[in-house]
Amino acid sequence: EKIKDWFNSEQVEICGGLFNDHPEMVGPLTSRIWNLKKGRETLLNLVGKEVKVFAKTTQGLSADTPRVLHLAGFSKALLMPHGENNIPTFRGPVFSWSSSIGRQIETFCREPFSSSTNHTFFHLAFHLGKLLQQDSSHTLAFFKTTSNSSIFYNYLLKANSLAPIFGNWLTMSNYLHEVYPSEYPGPISQD
C-alpha cells in the first residue's frame, strides 16, 4: 500500500514490463510481445498506474528489441549493466535506439555509480568534473544494490532535501521526457 502511494505521488517509478524474464531471443515475435503486454497489464493491476519505461533485470537483449518494445507500446527504455557486460557508451546519457522497421526508442544508457560504497563519493569531484567537461546533459545516476547505502549517499539526499544542490531528482520517465537523445545510431544488424 505504501509503495502504491509513492508510485501515485510521482516520487517513485517502476520500470519493467516483462511478465516472464527469460532470454529475449527465445520464442516467436508474438510471444515476446504478449510477454511485455501481460507484464504491463499485471503491473497496472498491482499498482494502479501504467509502466512507461521498459527495464530488464537480466541480460539478453537483441537487435530486434526496439521493434518488440514499440509493438508492445513502449517508447522509452533503461539499459543497465549486468555483471561483466557493459552498456554502450555515448556522449550523452540518452540515445535513440532504432529498430529495423524505423521506430525509435529513447534509451537511457549511463552506467550508474554504486550508492552502497564510499569509493563512489570519495571520487565524486572527479566524476562531476568529467561530466561537466564531456557530457552533453550533465547526469549522475546512482544504483542501489544492497539495502545499506553509503553514509555519504545519505548525506547527499539529506542536503538535497534542504536545497537542490545537485539539481532536480527525477523519475526515469520525467527525465526521458526532459532530456533529448544526443545520438541516433542506426539499427543494429541481426548478426
Indicate residue ranges for each PLM-predicted region.
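Catalytic-domain carbohydrate-binding cleft regions of carbohydrate-active enzymes
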Residues: 1-191
